[in-house]
C-alpha cells in the first residue's frame, strides 16, 4: 500500500457574507487576503493566510453555484477551529470586544485557552501551551 503524504489542511468556512468576517482575521490578527473571487458586488470566496495558517471563506450562494452536490449536503452547521498561539494575552488584547464563547481557562492537557465566535458564526478556540 502506498504511503499518503498529507501536506496541509485548510478549513473552508461557509457563510452568508464574507466581508463581516474579514476584520476579525485581517485587522485584529494580521492575516492577509491572498486570494479572492468576486461574486457580483460581493466576495464569493476568500483565502486568508499569515504564512503559517490559512482560513478559507466561501459564501453559501457561491457553494451552490460551484458544487450543487456539496451544497445539497450543507446544513448550515458552524465549524470549530483550534488555533495555537504563542501569547494568549496578546491574542485576547487583539480580540478585545469580540464575542467570547468560552472564557479563558487552564486545561488538564497543559494549555491556556479562550474561545470566540467570529462574525460568520464559526467558533475559534485559541490555545497557548506551556513549554
Language-model segment annotations:
Residues 1-12, 32-83, 92-117, 128-131:
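Vicinal oxygen chelate
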Residues 123-126:
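Short glycine-/small-residue motifs
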Residues 20, 88-92:
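Short, conserved charged micro-motifs
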Residues 21-26, 95, 118-121:
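Conserved active-site tyrosine of GNAT-family acetyltransferases
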